[in-house]
């Protein structure tokens, strides 16, 4: 019997990643998976040497990983390991319309625009799309019909990984996220559904809503501790988990 899958990549690369509190993220998603009758899949082993491919790119292989492991699935929710899901969150799989779903990127707009400009010029033959269509790849929903779409990105990486690394090293722009955005906006724009910010509350520090009183947790479903939250993402992952699940 097929089920919906929640997929997390939790690869320990160094001491920093070991001590980021990602276990609290996983625990929150364990609660959610049971609530909505989904299966949780945590990838904790590298697919490639880090010198060739960073773990962020493993998102493009999720459907292949599930098939290799003989996991039957309907839809897949991918989430970054620096997220906490609210215990009152409804079933995200019921609002997707069977499309590729993501949440627009909020904040870091200079970085977004520079990523668009440089990837467009150096890797996508001047194809460009509006910056306000750019999404954060830390929360995405997709399904079986997107297998060929992800396959095309895998092939692109295999052919262009040296140029991609050059762009990242010399222009200090995004990693997998800009490439994924270009493919979605170029190849499947009509199959792309934007979900509300409450499903990926990102860049909380710059929005000045991240505080010790945890007020932000009342206004959304997924807290995403990206974009350099202080003192560390691990601090907020632990604090948020205990606030939502242990109080």
Regions found by a protein language model. Name each.
Residues 1-61, 65-73, 189, 226-229, ...:
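N-terminal anchoring/stem segment of glycosyltransferases
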Residues 9, 43-45, 103, 195-198:
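Conserved beta-strand termini and adjacent loop/short-helix elements that scaffold enzyme active sites
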Residues 26-27, 85-90, 198-200:
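Short, polar loop motifs at secondary-structure junctions
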Residues 46-51, 108-110, 200-205, 230-231:
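A short acidic, often aromatic-flanked loop/helix-cap motif at beta-alpha or helix-coil junctions
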Residues 55-117, 141-142, 146, 150:
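GT-A fold catalytic core of metal-dependent nucleotide-sugar glycosyltransferases
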Residues 82-94, 219, 224-247:
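Charged, low-complexity C-terminal accessory regions
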Residues 117-131, 148:
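Short, flexible, basic/aromatic active-site loop/helix in glycosyltransferases
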Residues 132-235:
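Catalytic core and acceptor-binding pocket of nucleotide-sugar-dependent glycosyltransferases
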């Amino acid at each position: 019997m097929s089920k919906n899958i929640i997929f997390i990549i939790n690869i320990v690369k160094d001491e920093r990643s070991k001590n980021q509190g990602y276990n609290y993220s996983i625990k929150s998603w364990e609660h959610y998976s049971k609530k909505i009758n989904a299966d949780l899949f945590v990838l904790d082993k590298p697919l490639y040497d880090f010198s060739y491919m960073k773990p962020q790119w493993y998102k493009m292989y999720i459907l292949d990983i599930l098939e290799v492991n003989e996991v039957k699935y309907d839809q897949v929710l991918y989430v970054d390991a620096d997220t906490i899901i609210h215990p009152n969150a409804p079933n995200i799989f019921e609002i997707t319309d069977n499309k590729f779903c993501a949440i627009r990127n909020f904040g870091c707009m200079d970085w977004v625009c520079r990523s668009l400009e440089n990837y467009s010029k150096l890797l996508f033959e001047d194809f460009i799309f509006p910056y306000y269509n750019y999404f954060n790849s830390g929360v995405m929903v997709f399904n079986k019909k997107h297998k060929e779409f992800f396959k095309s990105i895998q092939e692109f990486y295999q052919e262009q990984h040296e140029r991609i690394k050059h762009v990242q090293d010399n222009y200090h722009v995004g990693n997998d996220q800009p490439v994924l955005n270009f493919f979605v906006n170029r190849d499947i724009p009509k199959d792309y559904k934007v979900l509300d910010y409450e499903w990926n509350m990102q860049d909380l520090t710059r929005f000045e809503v991240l505080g010790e009183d945890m007020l932000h947790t009342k206004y959304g479903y997924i807290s995403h501790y990206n974009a350099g939250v202080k003192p560390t993402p691990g601090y907020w992952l632990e604090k948020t988990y205990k606030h939502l699940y242990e109080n």
